[in-house]
């Protein structure tokens, strides 16, 4: 891992670019190799695990949550139940933190989990990531639950790998915004 960091530093590649460009591109190439049967399950698992390890190492250099931006926005980032693709959510969380937004990630939350969380923590927005067409209905339920728990006060955005293929279906979930453009979410929701 250190050798890889050294190579990126020698090429003057910023941490942000590693996280927002190179890691996602590597994940896309791994996915394409899997789809075309050039690599097997074990190779995909190991490769994605290494990308997550690299991302984790990069996150130690981005400390918005630990700095404690008292007036900064707080976002709830949700990976829906059954969703297997989590790397994108981790990249989004890192980028939000880099921009000064505090992020709480929850994986596969149930209704009671969200109820407890919303009762004890104030969030400025919720972002739901979806990578599978099978999760559109679950996203709609999450949007409805969040709206109910916050009496419609919290804005919700949906993003992820299927946005380009299922934008219309995702728009019908009731989310305020459906996009993969994080800058647009930050701007529209006034997060920074």
Swiss-Prot record:
Residues 72-192 form the B12-binding domain. Pfam families: B12-binding (PF02310). Coiled coil: none annotated. It comes from the Bacteria. GO terms for molecular function: cobalamin binding; metal ion binding. This is Uncharacterized 20.5 kDa protein in bchF-crtJ intergenic region. It comes from Rhodobacter capsulatus (Rhodopseudomonas capsulata).
